[in-house]
From Swiss-Prot:
InterPro entries: MetalPrtase_cat_dom_sf_prd (IPR023091), YbeY (IPR002036), YbeY_CS (IPR020549). Keywords: Cytoplasm, Endonuclease, Hydrolase, Metal-binding, Nuclease, Ribosome biogenesis, rRNA processing, Zinc. Its main location: cytoplasm. This is Endoribonuclease YbeY. It is an enzyme of class 3 (hydrolase). The lineage of its organism: Bacteria, Pseudomonadati, Pseudomonadota, Alphaproteobacteria, Hyphomicrobiales. Belongs to the endoribonuclease YbeY family. It comes from Bartonella quintana (strain Toulouse) (Rochalimaea quintana). Zn(2+) binds at H118, H122, H128. Its cofactor is Zn(2+). SUPFAM superfamilies: Metalloproteases ('zincins'), catalytic domain (SSF55486). It holds the Pfam family YbeY.
Length: 158
């Protein structure tokens, strides 16, 4: 079982129950898909706004702009490594996720779910630094999202 800790830092995120439900469903589906359903761990999510996300992105990645999701693993895992007692932290910026969903013709909840799955995979050691890593991570995202009845987020990008 994984304990989910959610902090809502922006009034733009106006439905904490919906955030918890989406996170729980995305987390369970991801962990089951990776055969990690028996892991005992904890994950923290911060739902914030673009202004705060830009500050965090500048501080930790030297990029002075907002982004959709940032992940900070508790341990430096490689893909396939067993996670520890703390998975890590995921931060999601509301305005960026809303804008991307509209631009890509997706529902907000589907895109948010994708960002949470993406963040969880980063916490579990998956990356997209190389072409091979990106292909592996995107394929996992497609498979997990399909189990959540969400269309391929990369279909129009391929």
């Amino acid at each position: 079982m994984i304990t989910i800790d959610i902090t809502v830092e922006s009034a733009r995120w106006n439905n904490e129950k919906m955030l918890y439900d989406i996170t729980e469903k995305a987390l369970k589906t991801t962990m089951n898909h990776l055969s990690l359903e028996n892991v005992v761990s904890e994950i923290s999510l911060l739902f914030t706004d673009d202004k705060h996300m830009a500050q965090i992105n500048a501080q930790w990645r030297n990029k002075n702009k907002s982004t959709n999701v940032l992940s900070f693993p508790a341990l430096p895992l490689k893909a396939g490594d067993p996670p520890g007692l703390m998975l890590g932290d995921i931060i999601i910026a509301q305005e960026t996720v809303v804008l991307e969903a509209k631009k890509e013709g997706k529902s907000f909840q589907d895109h948010l779910t994708h960002m949470i799955v993406h963040g969880i995979l980063h916490l579990l050691g998956y990356n997209h630094e190389t072409n091979d890593e990106a292909c592996q991570m995107e394929e996992l995202e497609r498979e997990i999202l399909l189990k959540l009845s969400i269309n391929d987020p990369y279909a129009e990008l391929s």
